[in-house]
UniProtKB/Swiss-Prot annotation:
Mg(2+) 1 binds at residues 34, 87, 159, 161. It holds the Pfam family XPG_N. It comes from Coprinopsis cinerea. Binds 2 magnesium ions per subunit. They probably participate in the reaction catalyzed by the enzyme. May bind an additional third magnesium ion after substrate binding. DNA binds at residues 47, 71, 159, 232, 234. Phosphorylated. Phosphorylation upon DNA damage induces relocalization to the nuclear plasma. Residues 410-418 are annotated as: Interaction with PCNA. This is Flap endonuclease 1. Belongs to the XPG/RAD2 endonuclease family. FEN1 subfamily. The lineage of its organism: Eukaryota, Fungi, Dikarya, Basidiomycota, Agaricomycotina. Mg(2+) 2 binds at residues 180, 182, 234.
Amino acid sequence: MGIKGLTGLLNEHAPNSIKEHDIKTLFGRKVAIDASMSIYQFLIAVRQRDGEMLTNDAGETTSHLMGFFYRTIRIVENGIKPAYVFDGKPPELKKGVLSKRFEKREEAKEEGEEAKEIGTAEDVDRFSRRTVKVTKQHNEECQKLLRLMSVPCVIAPSEAEAQCAELARGGKVYAAGSEDMDTLTFNAPILFRHLTFSEAKKQPISEINLEAALKGLDMDMSQFVDLCILLGCDYLEPIKGVGPKSALKLIREFGGLKEVVEHLREKAAARKAEAEEEDEEEAEEPAPTSDVEMPDDEDGEKDSDDEEEAERRKKAEAAKKKKAQEKAKSAKKGKGKGKGGIQIPDEWPWEEAKQIFLKPDVIPADQVELEWKNPDVEGLVQFLVTEKGFSEERVRKGAEKLTKFLNAKQQGRLDGFFTVKPKQAPPPAAKGKGAASKGTKRKGEDKAEGSGKKAKKK
């Protein structure tokens, strides 16, 4: 899922943190790619014309293998050296999210069956993509393929994004590659997005710089993690009523998630107490007397006391109705963020989620060796052609490209030889009288300055 709304916040408040590149400009870079995200992406995107996943004659799914083989070759052809990182055991806190995803897949299956009966082809395709699930077999087959391609793959103890971030921090790779923005929350210094997208999409590679993002948001790393949790992450139920703008405002106003949670819980308790007090007041109010027709007096007129009582009753009912309307209106507004109606779930262990981001379960970068060698061509033919039904000609051509580009001596990048110095800011413009004389020079002033004489003011 990633972090909801984070990209939009960075575009608005830290635009300098995001750059777009053509893939060709990334030659010479080593990148740790979130393989688990890539498998899911390939199972959804690599399809037949009828929208079904690619399969061989035996009915086995091959979309993930097709995606990994050809997209990796494209990456390598552009001078990039990829290393793939696979998910390990998910954190305990994530199990609730995973169970909800399972429920949604089951719902999509039922809706998909119904769409086959009465829906359109587009409906069937949409629901079938929602039922995609990455299996243990998918992971094992992709790992086998990558080893035959001689592309490094790492099995993370837990979250793949966290391990990618660790490899980038440790200098093993230049950047982490993933579509999940929580890779930044795991402290990846550089994040590449869209790296494994198909060439047909013509989607530029998005590079996000964490340091520039923190500077633009005016936050330290701890506050950034707090912001990401408040926006909505994989480990906690999202807080209804909190959007990107309100989340940023709350963190800036209170300084951290601990203070934000305390503030929101206090406001929720105050609203609850106020509502209970109003309910008690309404319960204590006397019920209006029933309308009973009173007999006329001797003059044929109603008693004046009865008229006064009726008027009081009428006013009381009108006041009660108005109060009820105001209460309903207030309750409706209170559901959003404007009237402090944000409700934090009773069970919301944000401290535990924060520890997962700040101290993730990863293999230290200095204990990981990434090595790119010659591919096992005959092994690839045996696996992809004999076992999975791929075209032998295309597999051998792909293997030739891998051999050529993985072993080619990479051309050095200019930014590896030079240190880019920040541009010196121009001196501040003078204000008030005499400002014009310090601005654009008039004719003759250059000569006056060159001779060391001070130009006379007119």
